[in-house]
UniProtKB/Swiss-Prot annotation:
Pathway: Amino-acid biosynthesis; L-tryptophan biosynthesis; L-tryptophan from chorismate: step 3/5. The keyword Ubl conjugation does not apply. Belongs to the TrpF family. It comes from Neisseria gonorrhoeae (strain ATCC 700825 / FA 1090). Keywords: Amino-acid biosynthesis, Aromatic amino acid biosynthesis, Isomerase, Tryptophan biosynthesis. GO terms for biological process: L-tryptophan biosynthetic process. This is N-(5'-phosphoribosyl)anthranilate isomerase.
């Protein structure tokens, strides 16, 4: 049986975290990128992590952050997986004693084709829409057909996903994991419980 894994990213409150977890999210993303409207600090992250039930993965998202600051956060917040969204290379990403996911901003098929070679130690790749100045969370999607024949390293689909289009996205790409942030929000940084539930329910229906 295939299960479509879901990650709800940009969680900013324990309430949003608990709702997503109870709705069936497999992972929750905490953004440690000060320029993001969904950024949180260590104190907030600790409160969110403490509220979660077992077996929900906590993912820390960084963008071109210093190794020193990443280690400080990892020492104070129970993080299971690191997700890198900046210009980090494999040597940088693999040094933190946590599995890591590397976001790839997709413009062409070669971005997808070359990603596994560039990040051989990644647990998974996350394919997101390219933007010249923003590192994810844009609400934009890329050409999903570029992934239709991809069979490399495990990967996650992101970029412009919503409860309305996640079914189509999975059917086109064959994704086994999906990541959403803005597509389930009431406003930036505040999740809409109904949208979160609908997104996860749709992903679950596609599991087989």
């Amino acid at each position: 049986m295939r299960k479509i894994r879901t990650k709800i990213c940009g969680i900013t409150t324990p309430e949003d975290a608990l709702y997503a977890a109870h709705a069936g999210a497999d992972a929750l993303g905490l953004v440690f990128y000060p320029q993001s409207p969904r950024a949180i600090d260590i104190i907030k992250a600790q409160k969110i992590a403490a509220a979660l039930p077992p077996f929900v993965s906590v993912v820390a998202l960084f963008v071109n952050e210093s190794a020193q600051n990443i280690r400080r956060i990892l020492a104070e917040v129970p993080i299971h997986i690191i997700q890198f969204h900046g210009d980090e290379d494999d040597a940088f990403c693999r040094q933190f004693d946590r599995p890591y996911i590397k976001a790839i901003r997709v413009q062409t098929a070669s971005d997808i084709r070359n990603a596994a070679t560039r990040f051989p130690n990644a647990q998974a790749l996350l394919f997101d829409a390219y933007h010249p100045s923003e590192y994810g969370g844009t609400g934009h999607r890329f050409d999903w057909t570029l992934l239709a024949e991809y069979s490399g390293k495990p990967w996650v689909l992101a970029g412009g996903l919503t409860p309305e289009n996640v079914g189509e996205a999975v059917r086109i790409t064959g994704a086994e994991a999906v990541d959403v942030s803005g597509g389930v929000e009431a406003s930036k940084g505040k999740k809409d419980p109904a949208k979160v539930a609908a997104f996860i329910a749709t992903a679950n229906r596609l599991s087989r």
